[in-house]
Amino acid sequence: MGAAGCSESFLDQEPENVIPESMIYEDKELVLSVLSNLYGRVNWGQNNGDYGSYDQLDEANKCYGSPWVIFTEYDRNSWRVRDYDFVRRVNLFLQGVRGSSALQDSEKKAFEGEARFLRAWHYFHMARTLGGMPLVGDQVFNYESGIDVETYQMPRSTEAGIYDYIISECDEIARQLTEQMTINSARANKWAALMLKARAAVY
């Protein structure tokens, strides 16, 4: 014969396998892991990471170079879903870095420059595909059930306006980033920002 009981606090325990966001930006190594994740999400062109190839202007079909799968119907617009999700992730990162008490000012400057570069690069590829589109800047929108979605609607910028934004961003980014090659040569530096500025100016 035995007895068992429980308390309400049992349901309020924090999961042990999830790091609270409030802790992430108080640890430089965790900040680096978030930045690394952003690099891994960057759109390097007309590819969404599934190794299928797409027509440049029509993602309705994709094909693989294998005899058993040639064409696969693709009936959801995965490209557009990912566009502003990435911008939001960068903006959340910028908020966290700027508000961190664990990072030195020089570290904040460098992290911010890299994240802004990735966002500018992302906008560059979006502009090449879509032309003009809304620019959200550093804003982070937190949608809650019942909110009128029209409050989040933003005017569409012109294509020229997008490239002007990228050029302006790259001028500031170049002042934030080092001229030296980083240990990981894939990370952005001043020259990468100036390269992106030059490419945007061509358009």
Language-model region placement:
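TPR/Sel1-like alpha-solenoid repeat signature
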Residues: R116, L194-A200
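Bacterial N-terminal signal peptides
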Residues: M1-A3
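Short, well-structured active-site flanking segments
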Residues: A127-V140
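Aromatic- and acidic-residue-enriched carbohydrate-binding clefts of CAZyme catalytic domains
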Residues: Y143-T151
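Aromatic-lined, polymer-binding surfaces characteristic
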Residues: Y143, N184-M195
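Membrane-proximal, proline-rich intrinsically disordered regions
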Residues: G5-G49
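Conserved, well-structured interaction surfaces
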Residues: D27-L32, S36, G40-W44, K62-L130, ...
